């Protein structure tokens, strides 16, 4: 009972802070995303048992911050230097470090830090990019929340009541095929209702297609997080949110959904 109360209290407080800063947008929201991305990166490094306070950890953090940088602040790109060149320079530094420490920091760990910074940095970057879109940026964020949360809830309740066939037992034993499909159906229904209220500038058929893709990719993001935790033998990615785990535990679906939402909006606009 105490754990449930803690879980509810944490969820309510976190949702209030998150939604408030989403509504405010601009610099406060960007700072929130930077903070969340930094914590998420440290959660991944901790899974790998890499030192957080170290030169590789610092390089990984700086690389993450560079990927998170909103488009309007990419001042260095005006000088012909792209994020790709900076990422390459960071990789070269990490590879040099493996030599200096005589392989106590390995090539595999260079790859892990680089991939972690790209995965967390680029995916959270699109949170900022979508919020900074025209007058519908805020509405698109709420739309993504509706799709993800309705998919999660639909998958859980349909899976509990009708689930028989395991979706991927080696990765997430509790997920079922019926729950996976149920999450998509519930997301489509609630996205349709959301469109009736919000009136996004997207034809209904396109909205349904986007919702379908996002619901699927959101569940894939959840499975990827489950696979990571199972591989590194951890229950939760972190404990910054009591009763809910870490940032990765709560935003695994968003990390897959936000880039695809941005690309699909560009495709269908």
Curated annotation (Swiss-Prot):
Membrane topology annotation: Multi-pass membrane protein
Cystine pairs: none
Subcellular location, record wording: Cell membrane
Pathway: Phospholipid metabolism; CDP-diacylglycerol biosynthesis; CDP-diacylglycerol from sn-glycerol 3-phosphate: step 3/3
EC number of this enzyme: 2.7.7.41
GO CC terms in record: plasma membrane
Pfam families named in the record: CTP_transf_1
Domain of life assignment: Bacteria
Similarity comment text for this entry: Belongs to the CDS family.
UniProt name for this protein: Phosphatidate cytidylyltransferase
Organism: Bacillus subtilis (strain 168)
Source taxonomy: Bacteria, Bacillati, Bacillota, Bacilli, Bacillales
């Amino acid at each position: 009972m105490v754990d449930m109360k803690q879980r509810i209290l944490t969820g309510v407080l976190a949702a209030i802070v998150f939604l408030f800063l989403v509504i405010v947008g601009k610099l406060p929201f960007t700072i929130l995303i930077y903070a969340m991305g930094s914590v998420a990166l440290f959660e991944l490094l901790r899974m790998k048992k890499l030192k957080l306070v170290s030169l590789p950890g610092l390089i990984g953090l700086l690389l993450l911050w560079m990927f998170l940088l909103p488009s309007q602040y990419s001042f260095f790109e005006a000088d012909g230097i792209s994020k790709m060149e900076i990422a390459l320079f960071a990789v070269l530094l990490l590879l040099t470090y493996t030599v200096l420490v005589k392989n106590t920091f390995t090539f595999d760990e260079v790859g892990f830090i680089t991939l972690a910074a790209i995965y967390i940095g680029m995916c959270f970057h699109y949170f900022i990019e979508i919020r900074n879109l025209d007058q519908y940026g805020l509405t698109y964020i709420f739309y993504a929340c509706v799709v993800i949360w309705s998919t999660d809830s639909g998958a859980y309740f349909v899976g509990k009541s009708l689930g028989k066939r395991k979706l991927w037992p080696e990765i997430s034993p509790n997920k079922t095929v019926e729950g996976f499909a149920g999450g998509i159906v519930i997301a489509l229904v609630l996205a349709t209702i959301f469109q009736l209220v919000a009136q996004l500038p997207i034809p209904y058929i396109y909205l349904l297609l986007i919702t379908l893709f996002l619901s699927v990719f959101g569940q894939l993001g959840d499975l990827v997080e489950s696979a990571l935790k199972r591989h590194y033998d951890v229950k939760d990615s972190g404990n910054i949110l009591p009763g809910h785990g870490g940032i990765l535990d709560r935003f695994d679906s968003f990390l897959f959904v936000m880039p695809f939402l941005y690309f699909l909006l560009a495709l269908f606009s």
